[in-house]
Design a protein with these regions (language model features):
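Feature captures the catalytic cores and cofactor-binding loops of soluble hydro-lyases/lyases
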Residues: 35-61
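Glycine- and other small-residue-rich loops at beta-strand/loop junctions that grip anionic moieties
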Residues: 6, 32, 52
Length: 83
């Protein structure tokens, strides 16, 4: 599951994730369980509205590390394959 975060095209962070979901380019949404609810709720709601799969990861540090960054991430979205 987390291997996908290293190998696939993705966007990292709440703002970029919201934009990607609004644009209809997202396949899967990953959200850290320890992220502030006020921050991630808009993404959760929009993802549910668009019938996207949401996968919850234990914490922001683990989600960031899985993406190959040295800081935590509240949310990450995997972009749909274009072809």
């Amino acid at each position: 599951m987390l291997e996908e975060l290293k190998s696939k095209e993705k966007v990292i962070g709440i703002k970029q994730s919201l934009k990607a979901v609004e644009n209809g380019t997202v396949k899967t949404v990953y959200i850290a369980k320890d992220a502030d609810e006020k921050v991630v709720n808009p993404l959760k709601e929009l993802s549910k509205k668009n019938a996207l799969e949401i996968i919850y990861i234990e914490n922001m540090k683990q989600l960031g590390k899985a993406c190959g960054i040295d800081v935590g991430a509240a949310a990450v979205c995997i972009i749909k394959d274009i072809w």
